[in-house]
């Protein structure tokens, strides 16, 4: 996808001349926390480019695991660091004293929302407690949360429910535990420690992007499902509810979110604000399902379940590890295990619920005019997964 988004008007450049001069005089240095995630990987690819605003950026990328092969071609300084470990953060991050912008795009999952709040709050606080005092030129912190900001947890759903759509940034918080609220509160408190330090919060919906490591990689998960159906000669049936099949959905392209980050980090009109992020169009899964089937040469099924019946990929795919191992061997794919690339819980969460659409008006009003065609976006990330040999290149002959 084209990265000329700023110059070509995907974001309306409204910096005054003095801001532009300051940007040219000082190199932008990024710390991407969660660099192997969907958005982190896009940032790592985009920031070092010479035509990226503020670019080429110097980039540090932090992730818990050793650097994967599919991330090695990005010209960044990779640091393996578990940000939930306070001692490890305090040992590895202080030398990064030239950082000017932090892009925080990672999270962890626990068995309850109370534990999610504690674990994710600690991770963010570890990073900010270490970086803010040690980075004299730190200017801005971008925090990625998500659309679940507007939705109660499963446990609290019957009591607190969700806001009516379209979801807008000025809606009040729900009376429920939500680790996104915890993270925002920590961010707003931490930035007070340094005069002039600004922040932005980014709330994407379902992300279409590339990361075999992501816990929320919907495109990759559906590609793995399609490849297994192809291998077994099965029909590609839609594992979701009728509302998702027939109703309108939206998504957020990982590259678009990265552009949104960079815009907010550099444009004064975006400082100290929370923003939704989505492609700006809508689609129906019954249309994208045909695209997925064509890409893997498999017979396209549809919504074929009796009322009240639920078929979930967590159940259907639980014994398919040996099938995936065979697909990997026969197609010369990257050596992955099914549990690494198939995030069935997440696809079940998305496809067994009707999409709750958001509004991008606030971003537009503040100067960000970026958008994506969601069908083209879906195809783009499928092709990238094939190119990096994460999934087979099967198509209809």
Swiss-Prot record:
Residues binding NADP(+): 36-38, 64-65, 82-83, 106-107, 144, 180, 207, 214-216
Native species: Nepeta cataria (Catnip)
Catalytic activity: (S)-8-oxocitronellyl enol + NADP(+) = (6E)-8-oxogeranial + NADPH + H(+); (S)-8-oxocitronellyl enol + NAD(+) = (6E)-8-oxogeranial + NADH + H(+)
Disulfide partners: none
Function comment: Iridoid synthase that catalyzes the first step in generation of the iridoid ring scaffold using the linear monoterpene (6E)-8-oxogeranial as substrate. Iridoids comprise a large family of distinctive bicyclic monoterpenes that possess a wide range of pharmacological activities, including anticancer, anti-inflammatory, antifungal and antibacterial activities. Catalyzes the conversion of the linear monoterpene (6E)-8-oxogeranial to (S)-8-oxocitronellyl enol, a precursor of nepetalactones, which are metabolites that are both insect-repellent and have euphoric effect in cats.
Presence of the UniProt keyword NAD in the record: yes
Family: Belongs to the short-chain dehydrogenases/reductases (SDR) family.
Active site: 180
Gene Ontology molecular function: oxidoreductase activity, acting on the CH-CH group of donors
Protein name, as recorded: (S)-8-oxocitronellyl enol synthase ISY2
Keywords tagged on the record: NAD, NADP, Oxidoreductase
UniProt feature coiled coil, ranges: none
Keyword NADP among record annotations: yes
EC number: 1.3.1.122
């Amino acid at each position: 996808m084209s990265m000329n988004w700023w110059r070509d008007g995907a974001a309306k450049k409204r910096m005054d001349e003095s801001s532009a001069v300051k940007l040219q005089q000082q190199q932008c240095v990024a710390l991407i926390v969660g660099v192997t995630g969907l958005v982190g990987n896009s940032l790592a690819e985009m920031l070092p480019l010479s035509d990226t605003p503020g670019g080429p950026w110097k980039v540090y990328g932090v992730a818990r695991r050793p650097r994967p092969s599919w991330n090695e071609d990005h010209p960044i300084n990779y640091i393996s660091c578990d940000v939930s470990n306070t001692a490890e953060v305090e040992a590895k991050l202080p030398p990064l004293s030239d950082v000017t912008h932090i892009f925080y795009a990672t999270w962890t999952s626990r068995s309850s929302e109370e534990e999610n709040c504690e674990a994710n709050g600690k991770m963010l606080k570890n990073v900010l407690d270490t970086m803010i005092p040690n980075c004299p030129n730190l200017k801005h912190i971008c925090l990625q949360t998500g659309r679940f900001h507007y939705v109660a947890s499963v446990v609290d759903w019957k009591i607190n429910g969700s806001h009516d759509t379209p979801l807008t940034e000025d809606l009040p918080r729900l009376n429920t535990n939500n680790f996104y609220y915890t993270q925002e509160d920590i961010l707003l408190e931490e930035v007070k420690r340094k005069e002039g330090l600004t922040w932005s919060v980014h709330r994407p919906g379902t992300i279409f992007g590339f990361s075999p490591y992501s816990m929320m990689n919907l495109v990759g998960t559906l590609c793995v499902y399609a490849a297994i159906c192809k291998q077994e000669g099965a029909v590609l049936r839609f594992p979701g509810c009728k509302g998702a099949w027939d109703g309108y959905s939206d998504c957020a392209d990982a590259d678009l979110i990265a552009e949104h980050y960079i815009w907010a980090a550099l444009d004064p009109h975006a400082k100290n604000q929370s923003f939704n992020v989505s492609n700006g169009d809508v689609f129906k899964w019954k249309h994208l399902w045909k695209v997925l089937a064509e890409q893997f040469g498999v017979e396209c099924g549809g919504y074929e379940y009796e009322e009240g019946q639920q078929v979930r990929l967590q159940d259907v795919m639980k014994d398919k590890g040996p099938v995936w191992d065979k697909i990997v061997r026969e197609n010369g794919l990257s050596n992955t295990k099914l549990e690494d690339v198939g995030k069935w819980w997440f696809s079940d969460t998305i496809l067994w619920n009707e999409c709750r659409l958001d509004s991008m008006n606030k971003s537009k009003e503040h100067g960000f005019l970026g958008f994506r065609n969601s069908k083209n976006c879906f195809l783009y990330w499928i092709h990238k997964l094939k190119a990096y040999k994460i999934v087979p290149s099967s198509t209809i002959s």
